[in-house]
A protein has these predicted regions:
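Short, basic/glycine-rich phosphate-binding loops at helix/coil junctions
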Residues: 34-37, 121-135
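Phosphate-coordination/substrate-recognition cap region in phosphate-metabolizing enzymes
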Residues: 55-125, 181-195, 203
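Extreme N-terminal starter segment of soluble prokaryotic enzymes
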Residues: 19-23
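Short, positively charged and aromatic/hydrophobic N-terminal segments
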Residues: 12-15
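Loop-to-helix element that buttresses phosphate recognition and phosphoryl-transfer chemistry
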Residues: 29-83, 87, 135-149
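Active-site-adjacent alpha-helix immediately C-terminal to a catalytic or transition-state-stabilizing loop
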Residues: 78, 91, 149-204
């Protein structure tokens, strides 16, 4: 989903022969992921498997001359980016931005997903994958999209020719990023499952 400001910026860049590359990836598997627990904004670090997934991202991107790298304030995003950059990239402009952090699951945070779904399947479905229904005390995907869109509209105009951007994000913040760049529908955005270790690449 592009705002008019970002569309205008896109056409200016296009006609000036501008080309920047953006690589977006989800953090590696965490302890909460492994245990099927709603993480939200709570801190949960990478498992040994998650560490290997992050190293795998780094191996795939080691030849990219990254100029800026964005992370959220959550340890799983930071740890993943640290492993991606380690040994391959030096002097990178490293930026922490809370707008790309995971969705706040509110009262669901720390609960087991399987048990929560079993107790109330229909309500679970609404909380988990609907666009505009937020769990008690938490965020809807629509609310996450608003802050992620604000982030993208702030940072993209500052990219310069030949910039290479890394974004270490989360499953629910990647959703609106993909909608922004790929022009997908709301239903498609809400239905995607983002696999740890997968890289989404874009050129603007």
């Amino acid at each position: 989903m592009l705002s008019w400001d970002s569309l205008s910026h896109f056409f200016i860049l296009y006609y000036n022969g501008f080309m920047a590359k953006i690589f977006i990836f989800r953090h590696g598997q965490t302890v909460d992921n492994k245990d099927h627990t709603f993480s939200g904004w709570r801190q949960t670090d990478l498992t040994p498997e998650g560490i290997e997934e992050a190293k795998g991202i780094g191996e795939k991107l080691k030849n990219e001359k990254v100029t800026k790298a964005y992370q959220s304030d959550l340890i799983r995003s930071k740890h993943t980016l640290e492993l991606v950059l380690n040994g391959f990239h030096e002097g990178v402009d490293l930026i922490t931005d809370t707008r790309i952090k995971e969705r706040d699951y509110g009262n669901l945070t720390g609960l087991n997903k399987d048990e929560t779904e079993k107790q109330n399947p229909e309500q679970y479905k609404l909380w988990h994958r609907s666009y505009n229904v937020a769990p008690p005390g938490g965020e809807s995907i629509e609310m996450v999209e608003k802050r992620v869109l604000a982030f993208l509209n702030d940072v993209i105009p500052n990219f310069t020719k030949d910039d290479v951007i890394f974004i270490s994000a989360h499953g629910n913040s990647i959703r609106p990023m993909r909608r922004y760049f790929e022009h997908i529908t709301i239903d498609e955005m809400c239905s995607f499952e983002h696999i740890p270790g997968k890289i989404y690449s874009y050129e603007i």
